[in-house]
Amino acid sequence: MLRAAAFLCLTALPASAQDCVVMLHGLARSDTSLLVLEETLELEGFQVVNSDYDSVAETVQVLAERALPPALAACEGTDRTHFVTHSMGAILLRHWMSENQVPRLGRTVMLAPPNRGSELVDELGALAPFEWVNGPAGAQLATDGLPRQLGPVWPGVGVVAGSRSLNPVYSTILPGPDDGKVSVAATRIEGMDAHLVLPVTHTFMMNSPVVVGQVLLFLRTGAFDPELDYVDLYETLTD
């Protein structure tokens, strides 16, 4: 396939040794949740800083101050700094970017970001078990909460949303298509360069070969390929 050939040519070109990718995991997760992406990007020549932080311990503001400075320090001396986030990791980054500038800023891929807040927090946030599991940062993610206060994103941002759910109960709360945790509509944000919906779930999307391929494509080219599929990826890997 022509698409597979194009993707093969793309991946055959190593990233600049001076390109760095900062990764931020989601709520109640850890850096290991992004291990597949981390290892793939490293194989493609990127320097990767997979930041780990205790996502349920503090507010988004405090978490961002703890996670971003050391991650960015690890990228010092590189040509460009890119970002890949999952879920609430995007809100940490948006808060940080609202108050700081990143020298030599590259591209950003947000996976399942609650950019317009979460209807689940609206419905369940007042319940004690929810607060215990998700902490102060989780409580900030209501549809009238912090995400809505942060404004448009910067140039070079691509968003991937999922449309498959592993939680039918949550999906009855979420409006329209959703990934089991975040509605597709809530992932959209003013200023984004691209938005892609894929049949993947919130919890496991970062391990999907197609998602990994789309992340790599966007970091390299600033665009997604909606037609990229498992056949293309298989042909690429077995060529």
What is each residue range found by the language model?
Residues 1-7:
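Sec-dependent signal peptide recognition
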Residues 4, 16, 76-77, 102-103, ...:
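Short hydrophobic "helix-edge" motifs at membrane interfaces and signal-peptide entry regions
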Residues 12-14:
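N-terminal signal peptide c-region/cleavage motif recognized by signal peptidases
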Residues 19-27, 31-32, 36, 42-154:
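Serine-dependent carboxylesterase/thioesterase catalytic core
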Residues 39-43, 184-187:
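Short hydrophobic/aromatic-rich motifs at helix boundaries and adjacent loops
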Residues 98-239:
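Helical cap/lid subdomain of alpha/beta-hydrolase-fold lipid enzymes
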